[in-house]
Amino acid sequence: MRSAKQYTSAQFMNTARISGIAFSPDEEKILYTSDASGIRNVYEVCLSDGRHRQLTYSLSEDIQSISYLLNDRCILFSKDLGNLENSILCVLEPTGKEIVITPGAEVQTLVHGWSLDQRSFFASTNERDQRLYDLYKFEALTFKRRLIYKATEKFYFCSISPDEKYVLFAKSDRKADSDIFLYDVSREEMKCLTAHDGDVLNCLAVFNGDATAVYYITNEGSDFRYVKRLDLASGESTCVEKASGDVAWTFFSPDGRRRISFCDDPYTTLRSMKIHDEETGSVFTLSGFDDRSLNCAVVSRSGRHVAFYAEGDRSPGNLFVHDFETRFTTQLTESLNRDVDRQDLVESQIVSFHSFDGLEIPCLLWRPHGTTETGRAPALVWVHGGPGGRLTKGYKGRIQYFVNHGYVVLGVNYRGSYGFGKTFYNADHRKQGREPLWDCVAAKNYLASLGYVDTARVVIIGASFGGYMALAAAAFCENEFAAAVDICGPSNLVSLAKKLPKYWDKKRFYDKIGDPQKDEELLRSISPLFHADKIKRPVMILQGANDPRCPREQSDEMVAAIRRHGGPVEYLVYEDEAHGFRKRKNAIHAYEAILNFLDANLKSNVIQVQSNPMEATVSA
């Protein structure tokens, strides 16, 4: 097998992360967001010559591009104040002046799209009540706004009809149960369109071009999600699209001529884009993307172009544009750091194993270049966040970094992961800290079957809820893993459930994990904090000081409890971070520190990347 050049954390993390798509009114430029500067800022790219231009220059707070304004003379964007997941809307004028158009430091603002005449846009904000989102119409010239819907319940905006007479909302009763509602703006009346018995997911509804029908995602009578069409005149609904796995979502082009769908393949974990011609009934996909997932498509106002992102294991997310007239597809960005040779990256393998009870668990396996069949490599069991998330194929610089340094990585889609059917998704209901964790323990048996993994040197690592799983493994399966790494994961599910952000849907969380009032004994029994006396193997915890999802106290208390019982723990706190690592300098430092921790505990030849004290605070 070929060997690979070894790279630093900085070289992997210097790959840009890009998102957001907005065409200029003349369709000659595209607005997008990139962290090429080290933090998210707004950029634009010219379609004719491929030139890029940075438009905002934030040094501390994330900025997300939204749209051009006023014939592309101004830019609409959102700013995350303090990186605490509270966003305000701002306008960037040609002079460089920024104007704030939504109030409040503890407010979330969500932009939904433009009116048919492009003179106004729609946005929801929770400034009146942090638990609820009111819908407004903003004038593009004056930024004056008019209330469209005042929320009395937790409804989520889906779509507004072209004539602005009706709005589609979704409402969840439980984690696996939701409905679509039609709101009559003039009558101020809300009507349920998808009344049903039992648990059925109905979500992501859109109007068709002339607003005579509603298309929405459902799993009614099916293990996977599909598209239904509801005729508003007759009330009849019919299935119009199914796939081998979930249809993730669907939407119409501004002219109504095309419908775009994204479909998840549970066998490859790749996401494909299907383009439906509403006039001819034909369906086609873009060629050249068989090994990559397509995401986040936007069709231009004229309907001539569709822009989208494509991402693969060895190809970070890049922006593409397809011309429906010429049938040419053009790549507009190159995100991978030029210092990294794509051939040195590792393509993941789709594998699976049978867990303790026989349930098949889908996984992704990264095997380092140069690993021999008789080798004894250390390994990481990589646990994704959620609960209800998943790990898919796609560029993951942090995983490639560890693989590049000799670690086999097995990404486990434990029971409860999204994308593998309704039955699999609901299999972790009120079972956190038990069955999903046991799936991760069973992953060691699969690693042993490979022949080239030293199962005495297997570490469990995860972020967010994956971090909780790592701590749970250290506490409840204390002899299974050589060490555990927790990145911003909760340790006390009782206090976490009591202090959820107000804008979260508590019912969905309680349904999946447990209600702190009714299920406190259950939550205590699966909270690592109350079982720290069992932790004997090395643990590393990394935490953002301003984390709104997993507050710092969750990690502070866990570290104190482990030390109180004599357990080994290393602790890093990042003073200018929230949930995860948004700033590149922090990501570089964090993953260097993790590698140092792994090497110190698993390898005889320690790579001294940076000093790694038992506890440290990392400042901006």
Language-model features, listed with the residues they occupy:
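Active-site-proximal cap/loop segments of hydrolase catalytic domains
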Residues: Y414-A620
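Blade-terminus and WD-like Trp-Asp/Gly-His loop motifs, strongest in beta-propeller folds
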Residues: I21-K29, I66-C74, H112-S120, C158-Y166, ...
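Cap/lid segment of the alpha/beta-hydrolase catalytic domain
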Residues: S335-A456, A463-S464, A497-K506
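Beta-strand-rich domains and repeat architectures in extracellular enzymes and scaffolds
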Residues: T8-Y43
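Structural motif
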Residues: I39-Y43, L84-C90, Q130-Y136, A176-F181, ...
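Beta-strand C-termini and the immediately following turn/loop, strongest in propeller blades
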Residues: I30-S37, T56, I75-N83, S115-L116, ...
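Structured, non-catalytic alpha/beta "coupling" segments that mediate domain-domain communication
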Residues: H305-F328, S491
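Multi-bladed beta-propeller domains
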Residues: M1-I18, V45-Q64, G82, V91-Q108, ...
